[in-house]
């Protein structure tokens, strides 16, 4: 079972860049691991650090600003997660501590991979995202509330509605990843297997 996602309130960091691709999110040289943990240390590695080994933080990159330490909601621009298909991208984001990414649009494969890893991609209009960037920049350290049950983002004194398809919403609300969905049918699977001839088991 994955962690259930119903509502999250968190610090917002504004990444004011469009077409952020998966190689920027987690560069290819860090993809050797086969577990989901440890990728957060290399999130946005080429932007966060001045050296390849990730020892010298780049003071001009927004994730390194003191006021955004501990951020769990990433505010981004259009076509977030484009580029090559790698599930390591949402792994890196969640391992770093992100629960939500808000953007005007997402690359299709990244969008699907996010749900599989309990990272909520929230799509709002360009105008709404512009408003949120202005709000965050005027109020560094502001927190947003993201309510998946009600499908709204509460930011300052405004509320923004978003839409998630019913199946993905159900899975996140109930903490169901691909394994969890399969286990919901465990009894039926076992019954089917028991009906098979011995030579087929």
Swiss-Prot record:
<dbReference type="GO" id="GO:0009098">
    <property type="term" value="P:L-leucine biosynthetic process"/>
</dbReference>
<dbReference type="InterPro" id="IPR000573">
    <property type="entry name" value="AconitaseA/IPMdHydase_ssu_swvl"/>
</dbReference>
<dbReference type="InterPro" id="IPR033940">
    <property type="entry name" value="IPMI_Swivel"/>
</dbReference>
<keyword id="KW-0432">Leucine biosynthesis</keyword>
<dbReference type="Pfam" id="PF00694">
    <property type="entry name" value="Aconitase_C"/>
</dbReference>
<dbReference type="InterPro" id="IPR050075">
    <property type="entry name" value="LeuD"/>
</dbReference>
<dbReference type="GO" id="GO:0003861">
    <property type="term" value="F:3-isopropylmalate dehydratase activity"/>
</dbReference>
<comment type="similarity">
    <text>Belongs to the LeuD family. LeuD type 1 subfamily.</text>
</comment>
<comment type="pathway">
    <text>Amino-acid biosynthesis; L-leucine biosynthesis; L-leucine from 3-methyl-2-oxobutanoate: step 2/4.</text>
</comment>
<keyword id="KW-0028">Amino-acid biosynthesis</keyword>
<keyword id="KW-0100">Branched-chain amino acid biosynthesis</keyword>
<keyword id="KW-0456">Lyase</keyword>
<protein>
    <recommendedName>
        <fullName>3-isopropylmalate dehydratase small subunit 1</fullName>
        <ecNumber>4.2.1.33</ecNumber>
    </recommendedName>
</protein>
<dbReference type="InterPro" id="IPR004431">
    <property type="entry name" value="3-IsopropMal_deHydase_ssu"/>
</dbReference>
<dbReference type="GO" id="GO:0009316">
    <property type="term" value="C:3-isopropylmalate dehydratase complex"/>
</dbReference>
<dbReference type="InterPro" id="IPR015928">
    <property type="entry name" value="Aconitase/3IPM_dehydase_swvl"/>
</dbReference>
<comment type="function">
    <text>Catalyzes the isomerization between 2-isopropylmalate and 3-isopropylmalate, via the formation of 2-isopropylmaleate.</text>
</comment>
<comment type="subunit">
    <text>Heterodimer of LeuC and LeuD.</text>
</comment>
